[in-house]
Amino acid sequence: GSEIQPR
């Protein structure tokens, strides 16, 4: 799946 990457 996709991982959340907070920028």
UniProtKB/Swiss-Prot annotation:
Record keywords: Antibiotic, Antimicrobial, Bacteriocin, Lantibiotic
One of the record's GO molecular function terms: signaling receptor binding
Listed GO biological process terms: defense response to bacterium; killing of cells of another organism
Top-rank taxon: Bacteria
Entry function: Lanthionine-containing peptide antibiotic (lantibiotic). Active on Gram-positive bacteria.
UniProt name for this protein: Lantibiotic carnocin-UI49
Lineage: Bacteria, Bacillati, Bacillota, Bacilli, Lactobacillales
